[in-house]
Amino acid sequence: MRFSLAILALPVLAAATAVPRGGASKCNSGPVQCCNTLVDTKDKHQTNIVGALLGLDLGSLTGLAGVNCSPVSVIGVGGNSCSTQTVCCEGTQFNGLVNVGCTPINVGL
C-alpha cells in the first residue's frame, strides 16, 4: 500500500517542482529589442541582399541578425509594444541598423 502511494505521489511532486524562468521583458545582454526583420545569416542570399541595401558586409556573421531594431523598455505599456519580432540581441550593432546575435523571444503581445 505504501509503495503504491509513493508511486502515485511521485508525478504530483514532479509537477509541483518550481522551474526557474526568465522574465519576458528582460534580456541578459541588454534591453528587449523590436526588429522589423530577422535575417538568418546561414541564408547567404538573404544576408547579401540585406547587406547590400544597408551598405554593410554581413558575410562573416553567424546566427540571427535583427534589422531596424529599437529598444522596448516596458512591454505593452504606453503604446511601446512590438508588432513585428521581439528579440534579445548580444549588443553588437552596425550603423545602428543591424543587431547581431539575436534570439527571438515570445512575450505574448
Swiss-Prot record:
Keyword Transferase on entry: no
Disulfide bonds: C27-C88, C34-C82, C35-C69, C89-C102
Similarity field: Belongs to the fungal hydrophobin family.
Protein location: Secreted; Secreted, Cell wall
Major site of localization recorded for this protein: secreted
Record keywords: Cell wall, Disulfide bond, Fruiting body, Secreted, Signal
Entry's Gene Ontology molecular function annotations: structural constituent of cell wall
Tree of life domain: Eukaryota
Induction: Expression is regulated by the mating-type genes in the secondary mycelium, and especially activated by both the MATA- and MATB-controlled pathways.
Pfam families found in the cross-reference section: Hydrophobin (PF01185)
Role: Aerial growth, conidiation, and dispersal of filamentous fungi in the environment rely upon a capability of their secreting small amphipathic proteins called hydrophobins (HPBs) with low sequence identity. Class I can self-assemble into an outermost layer of rodlet bundles on aerial cell surfaces, conferring cellular hydrophobicity that supports fungal growth, development and dispersal; whereas Class II form highly ordered films at water-air interfaces through intermolecular interactions but contribute nothing to the rodlet structure.
Name this protein carries in UniProt: Class I hydrophobin SC1
PROSITE patterns named among the record's database cross-references: HYDROPHOBIN
